């Protein structure tokens, strides 16, 4: 049975919700799924004053965890059109895994959130996907089998490169059911691919 890691960073809970949806989809495909988060780099007093969501249940991942999975789906909010520094810092520590080819052939994917529709969703996904490709992974996006990413009757995230959500400038907008459905669809597709490749 394929093992899937949903690895995320979420300051305000939007990506945490998307991570749970990705995991639901992967489980639906028959995979064993773990959800883990990367360490917070912001000092605790600053995080509290900034109203970060500090009660997230997912355990903190280690770099060596990555080698134990057939698929890794990475999610993080956008910071100025790229992944958050917390995720970047974590992935920057994976040089040892890269050097020994420990991630070659594993399945990977990306998901993100932005404050606005044009806040850098695709560039953030690319910043994650670039890492996955350097690690030698097989990247699976959000294919057009999920047709709701092309809806025009509502504000909705989603791109062929990965599931996304739009939070609003003040962060008050939570992922819509359409966006969560996209995350579930991508999680299921990634797990199905991992099962085909790794059993």
Curated annotation (Swiss-Prot):
Gene3D superfamilies of this UniProt entry? 3.40.50.360
Instruction: Name the enzyme's class.
Output: oxidoreductase
Query: Which organism is this protein's natural source?
Result: Rhodopseudomonas palustris (strain ATCC BAA-98 / CGA009)
In Swiss-Prot or TrEMBL terms, this protein is called: NAD(P)H dehydrogenase (quinone)
Under which EC number(s) is this enzyme classified?
A: 1.6.5.2
Locate the transmembrane regions by residue number.
none
User: Per its UniProt record, what PANTHER family does this chain match?
Assistant: FLAVODOXIN-RELATED PROTEIN WRBA-RELATED, FLAVOPROTEIN-LIKE PROTEIN YCP4-RELATED
The Flavodoxin-like domain sits at 4-190
Which cofactor does the UniProt annotation name? FMN
